[in-house]
């Protein structure tokens, strides 16, 4: 997409969208407002031309294969989750955990949700959907607020995914670092070695993961979360009276079919197959990509670098769905018509989320067209001294991610800016740690994404937990 420089006015669309989301509690309308005003600015103030461009931009989201795959596998995940619910997988899991004393306590339930979040690390949105769907019945039974569940969903998604190279997030970052390696900006270090060295230095992500376990174990509730938890315990209300859940419970939570027995395997087998397929998918797409790039005898890094994270995740969800269908056929759980109806019902339940993702992608596109991220980065570049480079890179990355709602877009902007700058400093015999600066980009991007009300991960967390979105953002912010 063509990118121009519009100066300080480039930050108006994200600022407007965030302000409207907080003021109106309507994320969809807020994103639409940000998209529209952005394209009006791009059109030189012409509202008619801006409106036409805004409509085209929302349609053109599907022109990007990666974005389209994310939307498709999110809808398919809705189908898989509802089949697991109706097919007795979720009840089977809940029956299994109910045998253990720890599952009957608030601490145990929160720890269970946190551990599930660690285990499903293939993609942040899938982590949120699985944790929310599996944990919500137990949290409601124990009167744990939906805001707390949304916090656990959010804090075990992006912060966990960014610490691992073998998932969609790792593949994206390695691809960006490989582009810098081709320009000679990594010196004698490989992209994978830089990524792995940056992991323990990614203080925000590491601390976010540690904190969610501390909160789960100690039940440490502060600020708005303390109010939400007190309401849930004393009044038995898991939602505030004025809450507006992103999706109603009855849309995304259906009971097990009466003739179907609870079976733990109906949840674990599809999820395990999905995770395995993601690893295999990265290997397959990476091998194909390496061959197309004329890489002879590709190694592990070459395969990971050439692999497609979004394709692998989509294959994983498709395999999980196929396994769930196979199990149901073997168990004679559903008729073919029931399969079709449930699949569409599950995808339909996720549809509001898919719409929000389209709008979030479209807002990111208008920010790219206006040069929002590059303008913010260029504004602080004169202040990037060797001592301040890592802290400022973190702050700028956080601001861009918060404003645009995308950590991946932030990575693309800031790695392109920060890595060559570090290379320049090092060529002048001024030592600046490249892994530290890369970790600042990644940590800042996750921090901004974690806090932003227009972030897709935050919206998915709210939806998966059936929580009010702005309540989720407000209660999570003190921890973030």
What are these regions (language model features)?
Residues 12-23, 34-41, 73-82, 114-118, ...:
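Hydrophobic core segments of alpha-helical transmembrane domains in multi-pass membrane transport
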Residues 92-95, 126-138, 167-185, 212, ...:
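Re-entrant/interfacial helical elements at transmembrane boundaries that shape
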Residues 48-150, 333-428:
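Membrane-embedded alpha-helical segments and adjacent helix-loop junctions characteristic
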Residues 45-58, 166-204, 211-212, 294-298, ...:
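Transmembrane alpha-helical segments and their short flanking loops
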Residues 128-132, 136-140, 148-254:
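Transmembrane-helix bundle segments that line or gate the permeation/cavity pathway
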Residues 2-79, 92-96, 100, 273-358, ...:
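Hydrophobic transmembrane alpha-helices of multi-pass solute/ion transporters
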Residues 208-306, 318, 322-341, 464, ...:
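Long, contiguous bundles of hydrophobic transmembrane helices that form the permeation core
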Residues 106-120, 144-170, 185-207, 228-231, ...:
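Alpha-helical transmembrane segments of multi-pass membrane proteins
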